[in-house]
């Protein structure tokens, strides 16, 4: 009887794996040990699916964002390796987190993420990061109009056919890196045979210039001469360094230009200098609003090439089987002084009322009563330095190793680069200062030791909002912390 029962169970298992539709089959992984560099696909799942998965799988999270991860065979195991670290970093995976991988065919998995409490990982009243933006019209040589709508700029581009196309800017980045010893690809290598079926030949460049910031006749002539000499198959991308490009670590790129001539997914591209032997690996980032920008690596590029606000940048795009490259062509007269009436880059709308000056934590957006409360508080604080807004999550307030993370955008611009400094925390109208250790681990900036005492003493709970105001002109690193209780908006 026992033997027949065992045989029956084996039959059911074989029927499940060999004869039933594979869509919806799943496996679970608990994040333990060295999970940030890769995770192993369970052996039983790998045995039954190994032949159906290509060398690359796609991981899709609940917010719809998809990541490509390489599957490596190591010691007879299938391991999610190249690309996994980026996925783990993007969703701030922590020890004890539980991930459910649900197969949906064609080497594609939907991934549900849970925290150690077995509840789906997420923030109260939070969906995904949404960056404020302003829209403006960009120009050809003879058309100089601009329309701003919010706080960052989206632009209209004029292509070679004379049709305008709309695109958008995005925000921020992590600290970049460049590789001075890498060889710059030759023009022959970059222009080796490629499939140009979807690439239109164009004789006119894409321009992205603010209102009234016209190029000089000499600059136009230099671009025209460059086009005639190089005869690019892909239009040049021409823009001007505004304040955000020079200081915020990003350069907005036309969505239409990026999709047509560069990439339509998050990827690293090679940035070269036409007259130097350096190359830089630059991230092309696409946010949830389909806004495109060059981010990680961009700051190093502008520092190494001494670019500044007002400089004209000419980029030549090139594609081959090995990837995408942008070649930077400096103009002899590259700097563009601001003429009277030129609209500078700004974080605020043009019509007098300033947008609340704050930065929210990653993958968060504020809406409803929460947004009203936060913006009212930020307006009341009137800080010159943007306020960092964080919604309290499990890892921030519970457990022995509690810590509070700052976004890479905020940290890169406003926080020190040295780790293990003491951060002093104060409440408004209180003189007592808490001491927490400011740490930097794997490019993650966070408050560690001492943060737990601040949480306990001030009875901070899951879903509460903390607004961190960096105090200016202080000899010691200090933040004023304003607290909005969850009960005030939910």
Swiss-Prot record:
Domain of life the protein comes from: Eukaryota
Region (Disordered): 161-191
Any GO molecular function: DNA binding
The organism's taxonomic lineage, starting at the top: Eukaryota, Viridiplantae, Streptophyta, Embryophyta, Tracheophyta
Name of this protein: B3 domain-containing protein LOC_Os12g40080
Compositional bias (Polar residues): 169-178
Main location: nucleus
Cell compartments where the protein resides: Nucleus
Organism: Oryza sativa subsp. japonica
DNA-binding region: 24-117, 236-331, 389-487
Listed GO CC annotations: nucleus
UniProt keyword terms in alphabetical order: DNA-binding, Nucleus, Repeat, Transcription, Transcription regulation
InterPro entries cross-referenced by the UniProt entry: B3_DNA-bd, DNA-bd_pseudobarrel_sf, REM16-like
């Amino acid at each position: 009887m026992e033997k027949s029962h065992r045989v029956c169970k084996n039959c059911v298992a074989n029927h499940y794996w060999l004869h039933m539709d594979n869509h919806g089959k799943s496996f679970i992984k608990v994040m333990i040990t060295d999970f940030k560099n890769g995770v192993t696909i369970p052996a039983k799942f790998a045995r039954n699916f190994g032949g159906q998965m290509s060398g690359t799988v796609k991981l899709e999270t609940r917010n719809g964002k998809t990541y490509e991860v390489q599957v490596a065979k190591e010691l007879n195991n299938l391991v999610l390796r190249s690309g996994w670290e980026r996925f783990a970093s993007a969703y701030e995976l922590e020890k004890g987190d539980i991930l459910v991988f649900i197969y949906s065919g064609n080497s594609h998995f939907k991934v549900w993420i849970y925290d150690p409490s077995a509840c789906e990982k997420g923030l109260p009243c939070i969906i995904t990061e949404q960056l404020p933006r302003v829209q403006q019209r960009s120009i050809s040589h003879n058309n100089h109009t601009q329309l701003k709508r919010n706080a960052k700029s989206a632009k209209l581009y004029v292509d070679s056919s004379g049709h305008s196309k709309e695109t958008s800017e995005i925000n921020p980045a992590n600290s970049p890196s460049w590789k001075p010893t890498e060889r710059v690809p030759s023009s022959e290598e970059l222009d080796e045979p490629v499939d140009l079926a979807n690439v239109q030949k164009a004789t006119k460049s894409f321009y992205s210039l603010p209102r009234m910031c016209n190029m000089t006749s000499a600059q136009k002539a230099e671009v025209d001469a460059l086009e005639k000499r190089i005869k690019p198959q892909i239009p040049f991308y021409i823009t001007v360094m505004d304040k955000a490009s020079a200081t915020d670590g990003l350069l907005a790129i036309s969505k239409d230009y990026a999709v047509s001539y560069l990439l339509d997914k998050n990827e690293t591209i090679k940035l070269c200098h036409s007259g130097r032997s350096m190359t830089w690996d630059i991230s092309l980032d696409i946010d949830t609003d389909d806004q495109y920008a060059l981010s990680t690596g961009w700051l190093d590029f502008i520092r190494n090439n001494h670019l500044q606000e007002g400089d004209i940048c000419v980029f030549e795009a090139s594609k081959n089987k090995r990837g995408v490259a942008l070649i930077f062509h400096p103009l002899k007269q590259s700097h563009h002084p601001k003429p009277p009436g030129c609209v500078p880059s700004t974080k605020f709308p043009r019509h007098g009322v300033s947008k609340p000056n704050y930065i929210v934590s990653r993958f968060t957006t504020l809406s409803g009563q929460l947004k009203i409360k936060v913006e009212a508080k930020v307006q009341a604080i009137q800080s010159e330095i943007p306020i960092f807004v964080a919604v309290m999550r499990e890892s921030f307030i519970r457990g022995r190793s509690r810590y509070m993370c700052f976004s890479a955008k905020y940290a890169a611009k406003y926080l020190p680069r040295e780790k293990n400094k003491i951060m002093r925390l104060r409440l408004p109208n209180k003189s007592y200062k808490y001491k927490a250790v400011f740490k930097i681990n794997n490019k993650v900036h966070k408050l560690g030791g001492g943060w737990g005492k601040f949480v306990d003493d001030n009875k901070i709970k899951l879903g509460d909002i903390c607004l961190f105001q960096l105090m200016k002109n202080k000899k010691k690193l200090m933040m004023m912390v304003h607290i909005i209780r969850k009960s005030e908006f939910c």
